[in-house]
Structures are given as C-alpha cells and as structure tokens.
Design a protein with these regions (language model features):
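Conserved polymerase palm-domain catalytic core
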Residues: 2-149, 154
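Alpha-helix N-cap/helix-start motif at coil-to-helix transitions, marked by capping-box chemistry
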Residues: 43, 47, 74-77, 180-184, ...
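Amphipathic alpha-helical core segments of compact helical bundles
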Residues: 54, 72, 76-80, 84, ...
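Short, solvent-exposed helix-loop connector elements
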Residues: 59-63, 191-205, 216-228, 245-249
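A glycine-rich phosphate-binding loop feature that marks nucleotide/adenosyl-phosphate handling sites
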Residues: 100-103, 142-152, 209-212, 229-237, ...
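A conserved non-catalytic segment of reverse transcriptases
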Residues: 135-201, 212-214
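Extended C-terminal regions of large enzymes
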Residues: 235-239, 244-291
Length: 291
C-alpha cells in the first residue's frame, strides 16, 4: 500500500487498473511447475504440488488453498520483471516515471502525469499484453480501466480505495480507505452471526464476532480508515445492545442501561480500532536538487 501511496505523491497520477480475466482458472500447470522447479529442488515438494494442481485439471489454481497465493504470485514473475525494467530504463536520477504494485492477480501501474510521458502509457500497456499472452492470461477489457487521479477518479487495490486529496496545507496527498464492498461484506458476515445466534447468550455472540472484527481491523488499520472504523464500531455496538434488549423482550437499545465501557470491559466486546500510524510518503528529490 505504501508503494502505491508514494507513487501518487510523486505525481504518478495516471493509473492502469488491471483486471485479469478468470486468472486463477487459467494458470497453465506446465508453465507454473517449470517456474517453481527453478527454485525448488525437493522432489517430494514438487510431487505434492503436482497432486494439488491435479485436482483442478490441466490448468487453474485452487482458490482458498494454503499455497494458492504463493503460486499465483510466482506465475506472474515475468510481468514483474518487465515492469521493473520499465522503471529502471525510464528513470531520471532518483525520479522514476513508472511504478507498480501487484499481489497475485491484483495489479495497478502508475505512470507520470506529464504529457511527455504519454508514450509510456501505451508502451507499458503493450508490453503488459505481450507478457500476459505468453502465460495464456487475458486482460478483462470490461473491468480494466485507465484512471486519472487529477480528475478526482479513484481505483482499488487489495481492498483499499485510492484517490488523491488536497490536504489542509494545500498539498496533494494520497488517501486510501476500505472499499465499501469490503465493509458491506464484513457487516453481512456479522449480521448472519447475530441472526443465527439470536437466542444464544451475548457472550457467545461476542466470542464469535471478536476474531472477525480483529482480523478485519488489523488489515485495514494501515489506511485512512478512522471514519469507516467508527461506522463499524457504532454498528456493532447497536447490534449488541439490541441482542441484550431482545433477550429481555424489550424494544430499543438500552442506551441508559449499559455504557460503552461496560460493553467493552465487562462483556469483552472488541474495541481495538486504532490505526497504525506511519510517516506519510514524501516526494522524491531529483538528483542534484537541494533538499
């Protein structure tokens, strides 16, 4: 995430938001095994890997498996190398005109906004298609798009929604928050637990929802998630209060009956919604400049 944020600070505001068509279903086993075999010499490990892949036929990586993210990353290493070369060959001193970030099939490429780099957008896109074609992977034309952050557009990467905002100091800064669909999915999962365990003691409900909340918050704590966290916290608070009141066959939320402190300290409801603070990215200084 920091790599993307840094690129936005450096005015790489033209973003190729890449969506790969049915990526996990189209990983070619022969190519994948060849790539893994260059690094793994253990025959037992290679045999186990073949057995795992065999379950999906002649191509595809089983989603949800322990090794699936690793295999999905390994398969696109040539794409990484191509983009790293693009960064190196277009570098001018300390400043780069291209940056990218990828995890498995989630890929974004950020390019300098200056008109002199218009050619670079087409060149990178062309080379990307060439490398993907060698791997039997296609770009989903309907979902892939070119984003211009200077026009207020946004793009998503690894569950975060990125955009560029003007700070109080009149400096353009990146902002990345949890995507709305991620928050919606979280609340749907929690709502199902409240529904399924409506007649169970509140302690049992909290025992089930706390690990879900902890994992979700820990993941999104690196972003500008305070407003989203406040929404989730209030939503869970109300759900717990309704559960308690329903058990007493009463309406309302029991605002005067139970304090928030009681919910967190007495019942043990998850309450660690703190953000992980880190130094904001700064613009790279070109070679020879005075810092």
């Amino acid at each position: 995430m920091h790599r993307v944020a840094q690129a936005i600070v450096e005015e790489k505001t033209r973003v190729i938001d890449v969506d790969l068509r049915s990526y996990f279903d189209n990983v070619q086993h022969a190519l994948l095994l060849k790539k893994v075999g260059r690094r793994v010499q253990d025959t037992a490990v290679m045999h186990l890997l073949k057995m795992i892949l065999k379950a999906t036929g002649k191509k595809g990586v089983p989603q949800g498996g322990v090794v699936s993210p690793l295999l999905s990353n390994v398969y696109l290493t040539e794409v990484d190398r191509m983009l790293e070369r693009a960064i190196t060959t277009t570098r001018r001193g300390k400043y780069t005109h291209v940056q990218y970030a990828r995890f498995a099939d989630d890929l974004v490429i950020l390019i300098d906004s200056h008109p002199r780099q218009d050619w670079l957008v087409k060149a990178v896109e062309k080379r990307l298609r060439e490398e993907l074609a060698k791997l039997g992977v296609e770009i989903n034309e309907e979902k892939s798009r070119m984003v211009d952050l200077t026009k207020g557009d946004s793009f998503s990467f690894l569950g975060f929604e990125y955009r560029r905002i003007l700070s109080r100091n009149k400096v353009w800064r990146p902002q990345y928050v949890p995507r709305l669909k991620k928050r919606t999915a979280l609340l749907a999962k929690l709502r199902e637990i409240f529904r399924r365990y409506v007649s169970q003691p509140v302690e049992r409900v909290i025992e089930l929802i706390n690990p879900i909340l902890r994992g979700w918050v820990n993941y999104f704590a690196v972003g500008h998630s305070s407003r989203c966290f406040s929404f989730v916290k209030d939503w869970v608070d109300k759900k717990i209060r309704r559960h308690l009141m329903r058990a007493r066959q009463r309406s309302g939320f029991g605002w005067n009956r139970w304090s928030r402190q009681w919910l967190y300290e007495k019942l043990g409801l998850f309450n660690q919604y703190q953000l992980l603070r880190r130094e904001p990215p700064s613009k790279a200084q070109p070679t020879g400049s005075v810092s």
